[in-house]
Amino acid sequence: MSTLHKVKAYFGMAPMEDYDDEYYDDRSPTHGYGRSRFEEGYGRYEGRDYSDLRGDPTGYLPLGYRGGYGDEHRFRPREFDRPDLSRPRLGSWLRNSTRGALAMDPRRMAMLFDEGSPLSKITTLRPKDYSEARTIGERFRDGTPVIIDLVSMDNADAKRLVDFAAGLAFALRGSFDKVATKVFLLSPADVDVSPEERRRIAETGFYAYQ
């Protein structure tokens, strides 16, 4: 094409069909808004519950793949992450083990009730009802320290036995002391039980093993 014809085509004096140049091509431009490589391969994922981007005018990303997991949480606490409330705490376990060790320690018990100790003749009675009060009175009258364990008795009978034992201690100049819950020590006049010895009786749980 001559230079004059190109000038005419530029100013509209010649039809564009006659304008033939190496830079002009009626084909689609090489760089444009054609289908992207992503869209060309998109059809392979249409059957797997992926959100469709092509019809979304907002251009936001899809929520993602919805298959397989549903609406459940992706992460759940593992079994060993959950606190097990049925297990005992360490502090309570140590306290219980300490009491158990004291109760089963033969050396502590031997020191407390060795020969010559005022408590060497001690006996433990576990009355079931008030009718056994006579046995308690006879042991106490004979000069034997008596541990009275009323745990298995109902409160009414236990109260009557406590009153009876307190009366015995007063009448015969003895002593009547509480060792533990519903457990009492009735001591004759010639047996002096110190507060430390009463504490050791409670700690060793001696009355529970007689």
Swiss-Prot record:
- Keyword Zinc-finger set for record: no
Location comes to:
Cytoplasm
Q: Which Pfam families match?
A: SepF
Query: Per the record, what is one GO cellular component?
Result: cytoplasm
Could you tell me the keywords of this UniProt record?
Cell cycle, Cell division, Cytoplasm, Septation
Q: Spell out the family assignment given in the record's similarity comment.
A: Belongs to the SepF family.
Explain the purpose of this protein.
Answer: Cell division protein that is part of the divisome complex and is recruited early to the Z-ring. Probably stimulates Z-ring formation, perhaps through the cross-linking of FtsZ protofilaments. Its function overlaps with FtsA.
Subunit field text: Homodimer. Interacts with FtsZ.
The protein's name: Cell division protein SepF
